């Protein structure tokens, strides 16, 4: 370094320090990029706010709203038959306050919208059941109001619904074109004695398909008591119906459902012991798929020995189509000289594409066939009509069906979102036809709609 230049360097540093000390401070910009416009900043804030509070709508739902299950048009009833139907109508509430319900389960908040009422009514009209078993109805007043307002031309002169003390304020009900009598419920039934049917050994329980044994044993009763009633059929015979709605939930509540099912099986078995030729049906929402224990028990010959109406679907009993061996498109014997033929390569490619398309088509057909008999928005079959041996004899072959109603898209959140227009329930109705010596084909009209009476605290 040239020492002679050192004084100049020191002076330069001193001058720079003095200028920096006197000059006003410079506020740094938020970003090295050009400043954003007011509109851009507003859009950013809106996007941030939307991402924090609004539901995600940017992605297209994997499944759009539509008819996902069942058939689009209910078949007409054959002459001389009676149609037995079931429908969980997902919390049918009228507009009259029930003082016993408040807070989260205030019935006024739960009032069923006009659109849903009309959609439910349309499904019930199309189903055209002579005897219709319903689940999740607020009560007799609400059912009567709904019938008189939306089903005046259906001929449902008779109805039944009884308060079961369920905390959400819903119960099982009946609408019928034929007289109803001997209505019963079991609101205090102790299910503990049903434990005698369940193995104590954990491994044995699993082997037999029972639910896990609860660590804490609480006194259990029917979550929603079944409703039992007798229908006087036009033929002069009687039809005994149990309208059921088992405890909801997954594996954690399987044990409760099984106890409910066991007690129901005892009741049905007792009925059939008195009269093996009795017309007895268990109808409703079991909250269990066909291979779960709570549902299988009904079909067990050691218990009630009932037959599921699913056995009377059009496809039931048909021989399975044998798999035919597809020709191998790459077989070298197709070429006499074994040469690489361009036309053969093109043919192979087309054959491969056709095979893939056929496989995809068959998979779609298989899925569509399965969807014909799913009944719940969760892609499950959990709604049933279970028949006694005498009813099996008069069940019309291939007459069982699931009637398709509009289901929301896969992005629907029932806790937050309003259901789409035309939505009726998270369940689809089901039905089967029964032969009868004489049927009441006429549909007498009910009286004009009357406003539901004010509810009392104790129903």
Placement of each model-derived feature along the sequence:
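Active-site metal-binding loops of divalent metal-dependent hydrolases
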Residues: 89-92, 137, 246, 284-286, ...
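A long, amphipathic alpha-helix that forms part
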Residues: 254-276
């Amino acid at each position: 370094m040239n020492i002679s230049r050192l004084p100049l360097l020191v002076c330069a540093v001193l001058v720079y320090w003095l200028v920096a000390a006197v000059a006003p401070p410079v506020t740094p910009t938020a970003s090295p990029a050009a400043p954003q416009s007011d509109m851009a900043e507003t859009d950013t804030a809106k996007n941030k706010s939307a991402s924090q509070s609004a539901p995600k709508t940017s992605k297209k739902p994997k499944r759009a709203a539509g008819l996902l299950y069942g058939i689009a048009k209910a078949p007409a009833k054959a002459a001389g038959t009676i149609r037995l139907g079931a429908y969980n109508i997902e919390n049918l509430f009228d507009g009259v306050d029930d003082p016993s319900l408040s807070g989260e389960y205030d019935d006024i908040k739960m009032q069923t919208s006009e659109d849903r009422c009309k959609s439910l009514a349309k499904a019930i009209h199309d189903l055209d059941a002579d005897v219709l078993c319903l689940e999740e109805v607020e009560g007799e007043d609400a059912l009567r109001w709904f019938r008189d307002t939306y089903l005046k031309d259906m001929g449902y002169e008779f109805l039944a619904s009884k308060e079961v003390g369920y905390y959400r304020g819903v119960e099982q009900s009946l609408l019928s074109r034929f007289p109803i009598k001997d209505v019963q419920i079991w609101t205090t039934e102790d299910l503990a004695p049903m434990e005698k049917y369940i193995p104590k050994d954990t491994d044995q329980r699993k082997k037999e398909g029972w639910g896990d044994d609860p660590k804490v044993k609480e006194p259990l009763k029917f979550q929603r008591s079944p409703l039992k009633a007798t229908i006087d059929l036009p033929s002069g015979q009687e039809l005994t119906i149990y309208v059921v709605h088992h405890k909801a939930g997954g594996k954690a509540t399987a044990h409760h459902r099984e106890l409910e099912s066991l007690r129901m099986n005892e009741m049905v078995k007792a009925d059939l012991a008195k009269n093996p030729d009795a017309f007895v049906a268990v109808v409703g929402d079991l909250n269990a798929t066909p291979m779960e224990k709570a549902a299988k028990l009904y079909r067990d010959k050691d218990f009630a020995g009932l037959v599921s109406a699913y056995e009377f679907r059009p496809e039931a009993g048909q021989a399975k189509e044998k798999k035919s061996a597809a020709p191998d498109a790459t077989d070298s014997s197709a070429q006499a000289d074994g040469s690489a033929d361009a036309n053969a390569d093109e043919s192979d490619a087309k054959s491969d594409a056709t095979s893939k398309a056929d496989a995809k088509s068959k998979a779609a057909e298989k899925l569509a066939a399965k969807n014909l008999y799913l009944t719940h928005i969760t892609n499950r079959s959990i709604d049933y009509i279970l028949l006694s041996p005498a009813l099996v004899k008069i069940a019309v072959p291939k007459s069982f069906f699931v009637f398709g109603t509009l289901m929301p898209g896969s992005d629907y959140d029932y806790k937050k979102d309003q259901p789409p227009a035309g939505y009726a329930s998270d369940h689809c109705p089901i039905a089967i036809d029964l032969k009868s010596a004489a049927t009441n084909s006429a549909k007498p009209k009910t009286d004009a709609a009357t406003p539901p009476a004010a509810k009392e605290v104790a129903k």
